Amino acid sequence: MDAPIPTPAPIDLDTWPRRQHFDHYRRRVPCTYAMTVEVDVTAFAAALRRSPRKSYLAQVWALATVVNRHEEFRMCLNSSGDPAVWPVVHPAFTVFNPERETFACLWAPYDPDFGTFHDTAAPLLAEHSRATDFFPQGNPPPNAFDVSSLPWVSFTGFTLDIRDGWDHLAPIFTLGRYTERDTRLLLPLSVQIHHAAADGFHTARLTNELQTLLADPAWL
């Protein structure tokens, strides 16, 4: 699958409020952080039970929707090594091959309409459900971010240690197994963030917006 690769827009460093923060966490104290939250998916799961659409792709689309709202989660480094922002980013997501106990990484172009996205992504999942290559479509585009799923376990913490990953500004999401508590259905979600790209405020806003989106799943 091919998609036009846009040109990221450079950030005006003279007016960027986070210039000093970016420099600090990119050069002086390079670091990432992980935030794990429980998202209430009670209404979301109930709506999916009445829908033929796939819950995993609905989760992926919801993540892509809130990610694309905010420049800090569409950041990259341009060819000069300066911070820039993609006009749109696409989700790359895993599919598990139970026979080999390995997974493949797929990607689908983001569309603000869930139905359009699902119609593109669902056949990809079906086609590559037994994939033996890590990237059966070839490498994802540079304006992609990663989503993986661990539907076998519910967790309260998850961290990725990325050696020398200081150029990776895109967020990384990990989804877990639903758990029920006090009649509510909860989804564990871990978000791995480069601190140069976003602070705790930005990540909290992202997860809160995801909660709001899943609490009113009329878009399904």
From Swiss-Prot:
Keyword Oxidoreductase: no
Reaction catalysis annotation: chloramphenicol + acetyl-CoA = chloramphenicol 3-acetate + CoA
Keyword Transferase: yes
Catalytic residues (positions): 195
GO-annotated biological processes: response to antibiotic
EC number(s) stated in the UniProt entry for this protein: 2.3.1.28
Keyword line: Acyltransferase, Antibiotic resistance, Transferase
Domain of life: Bacteria
Subunit structure: Homotrimer.
General function of this protein: This enzyme is an effector of chloramphenicol resistance in bacteria.
Designated name of the protein: Chloramphenicol acetyltransferase
Organism: Streptomyces acrimycini
Organism phylogeny: Bacteria, Bacillati, Actinomycetota, Actinomycetes, Kitasatosporales
